[in-house]
Amino acid sequence: MDSNSKKIYDVIILGAGISGLGSAYNLLRNKNSSFLILEKNEGVGGTWRENTYPGLCCDVPSHFYSFSFAINPDWTKTYPEQYEILDYLENITDKLKIRPFIKFNSEVLESKFNEKENLWETSLRSGEIYKSRSLISGLGQLNKPKWPEIPGIETFSGHSFHSAEWDHSYDLANKRVAVIGNGPSAIGFIPKIADSVSKMIVFQRSPNWIVPKDDRIYNSFERFCLRYVPFYAKMYRFYWFFLQERNYLAFYQKHNFFSKFVERAISAVLTKFKLFEFEKVYAAGSLMLIDEQIQDESFKDKLIPDYPIGCKRIIPTNDYFPALCKDNVSLETSLIEKISSNKIHTKDGREHEIDVIIYGTGFDTNIFI
């Protein structure tokens, strides 16, 4: 047994992802608390280490999706990709001297409070038990695949995997690929693999509200200012903070200054679409994107949700609709009835022969351990 497991810590932190690292930094600043981070993987990063599917990136601007106490002047673009976020988290772990407080390859099975000892007891798969006076859970929700309940899913004889467990060893070239799901994960990887497969069928249960993504690469002058001009990086980060808060207040708080300001600012768009509330601004942006990127009117109808924008996650992207328009890509909106050895059967009576199934069906967000 690890000798450290006999020690009683002030705080045990579960997970060395963004939440765990942020908690550790604040405990280090306090300097009066002994703590240990228990991380199941071999490195930090949490979801940004475990998820590696093509096209994975953050839909929050990079200078806002980072710690205020560890501003990064070297982000290469507005919306960073997975590897860049993981590099950032690895770097700050060392820069802030957090790594010595992390026990890697330590999968937590349970944490329970011992009322008799007035301590938390955290049990690992290895059999070790760590005790602490306080417990901080930094366990994320975006790492356990959610598999659809489709009859015959286990009978498929071809290759299959979930986007959360991307099989990089499998060559998709010249394969007939079925993608089940069209949420954020699928919308991320579909454009990246569409050109390499011989045929792709995207099975869509319901469309999502998709809006334009204002993404660009930072030029050398901008990065110079972010690194060397006093307070510029903090001001730029606050700029993104303000935009996010403005959108929240305007979207969820009706008839306030922010919502009225934005409605006036894009009155031309609102008039065109006969929409008069702030959340309709996003809908207008989505409809404009569809108009610009899709020519077939009947195809457009399949991509417009029948529910109000904001009921589900709004997805920013510029390359999903063009991917669906490729000659080797088709969108299937008939519901899946069952899966057989080499086919997907839809409820309209058709059969689709395929070589591989990629499940882009998201995560089981109700399971933490």
Give a label for each model feature.
Residues 72-91, 103, 274-282, 307-319:
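Short beta-strand to alpha-helix junction loop
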Residues 356, 360-369:
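Glycine/threonine-rich phosphate-binding loop and adjacent beta-strand/alpha-helix elements that clamp
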Residues 77-143:
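Feature captures the FAD/FMN-dependent oxidoreductase FAD-binding
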Residues 5-8, 13-18, 22-37, 41-43, ...:
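Rossmann-like dinucleotide-binding core of oxidoreductases
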Residues 104-119, 329-347:
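A conserved short coil-to-beta-strand element within the FAD-binding core of flavoproteins
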Residues 7-9, 125-134, 172-173, 347-356:
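Core beta-strand elements of the Rossmann-like FAD/NAD(P) dinucleotide-binding domain
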Residues 9-13, 18-102, 204-205, 292-298:
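Beta1-alpha1 glycine-rich phosphate/pyrophosphate-binding loop at the start
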